[in-house]
């Protein structure tokens, strides 16, 4: 998905599921010598070499939406928005993707397919979602289990890739390359974690 020159890619999951860490990892995969990357974050959590990183400050009125408007004037190739929280930011993110930018962000919903519903609930027109959304990743963090004790954590992923903007919403499941259930089953079978831990994390 990162090879596509424009479109919207969203990472979702509950609070504390590692969404931002995944977002940072994906951004570091970009060739920043050839790609102009601007990040809007609240707060800036880690340095991304070669990127322009801007901290959001809602207390003084510098919101994601206002930051995104100013960023678009600088003509970036890729835009990272720390989180899509409201209708204004969602609409600006979608319209940025529509005008030839690669946009990556996080959004608060539980499943990759649920991203579509969440955007519509925020008031984004379905035709705009269809024209821009190229994929979504849902994730959970689970504790590793060695058979006797828990130590460290690992991620379970769900991966939705939308090949074209002609895909119908009722066909989205056909484009779910990996489900959270598949990922959990694999982690348990490889003795990475326990079935109890999977159930605990939902």
Predicted regions and their residues:
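Short, flexible helix-loop junctions that flank or precede catalytic/ligand sites
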Residues: 1-202
């Amino acid at each position: 998905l990162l090879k596509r020159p424009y479109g919207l890619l969203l990472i979702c999951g509950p609070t504390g599921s590692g969404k931002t860490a995944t977002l940072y990892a994906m951004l570091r995969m970009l060739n920043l010598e050839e790609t102009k990357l601007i990040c809007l974050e609240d707060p800036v959590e880690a340095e991304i070499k070669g990127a322009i990183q801007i901290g959001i400050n809602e207390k003084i009125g510098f919101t994601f939406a206002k930051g995104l408007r100013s960023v678009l004037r600088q003509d970036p190739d890729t835009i990272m928005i720390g989180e899509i929280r409201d209708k204004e930011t969602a609409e600006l993110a979608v319209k940025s993707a529509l005008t030839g930018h690669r946009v990556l962000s996080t959004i608060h919903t539980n499943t990759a397919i649920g991203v579509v519903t969440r955007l519509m609930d925020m008031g984004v027109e379905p035709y705009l979602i269809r024209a821009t959304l190229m994929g979504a990743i849902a994730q959970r963090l689970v504790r590793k289990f060695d058979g006797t004790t828990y130590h460290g954590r690992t991620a379970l992923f769900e991966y939705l890739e939308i090949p074209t903007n002609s895909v119908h919403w009722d066909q989205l499941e056909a484009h779910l390359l990996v489900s959270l259930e598949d990922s959990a089953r694999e982690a348990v079978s490889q003795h990475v974690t326990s079935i109890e831990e999977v159930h605990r994390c939902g």
